[in-house]
Amino acid sequence: MDLIQDIIRRAKANPQHIVFPEGTEERTLKAADRLLAEGVVRLTLIGDPSAIRSHAQELGLHNIDKANLLDPKNHEKKQAYIDLLLDLRRKKGLTEEQAAVLVEDPLYLGCLMIKAGDADGELAGAINATGDVLRPALQIVKTTPGISCVSGIFMMFLPNNTYGENGLLLFADCAVMPNPTAEELAQIAVSSAESARAIANVEPRIAMLSFSTKGSAKHELVDKVVEATRIAKEMAPELQLDGELQLDAALVSKVASLKAPDSPVAGKANVLIFPTLEAGNIGYKLVQRLAGAEAVGPVLQGMAAPVNDLSRGASVDDIYKMAAITANQSIALKAKKG
């Protein structure tokens, strides 16, 4: 778990402005207090400022006033955000009256702050469903140019450090896209490469997984992975990426030497792209429960700016870590833009 400490160190070295739309929620407040005390990020907490301060006092938190406390119903940029939302959504039939209501929704307000350049990223989901977090993000922040789908990646820290990157594997998509097309699967692979560099600080070696290795089985499901591999290589020819590969061929060098001897990643993959959400979700939970791996995520990828969705069962520590991860995504995005 030294990687988590490295993620926190990088965040502290270049503090990013992260928005917490659920600013009055207890776990969120506790995580915010720790983040502010340690200087990991700069924060905006959305909610009634008096309610935030009162709750923080009840919880014995002493750093919340270091955050920007933003009342969604009354702040100096409200009209500017209404105008921005109208510019973005007028063609979809949004009226000024509707926009005025939406900008008071903390999830919309957080995304508008990002779009306006007033914040670098958002973290929500402790008390909101994934769909409610993603909807304003897709409408306002939108996806990365050249990427049409959002996906979710997990960092899996295995007790056995012979796999992946000293025991670190990245799994995608385990959270968002139920049955991606070949093109969407390729986009997930390219987005995952960006995440590997931005969050894990590793050079990705990507395996496109299937139940077949290099033509060992014939099926339309295999064809999808083969096509996704071709598209991903066209999108990002510099990537170390190969498919289709079975899991053992992707991770075990002895198996790789037999099944895919000419593959640039077989036997040493550190990023695993699953063909469906069903496979990815089951896969990460199997490794978590049966192999004793620690799963950190999902981290959303494919957005034009970082917006992350928490599990509603997230702990204070989960929120703390995800805020630092969100900051790392922002740092990497800014570096890429120059």
Regions found by a protein language model. Name each.
Residues M1-A266, V271-G338:
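Anion-binding alpha/beta catalytic cores of soluble intermediary-metabolism enzymes, centered on
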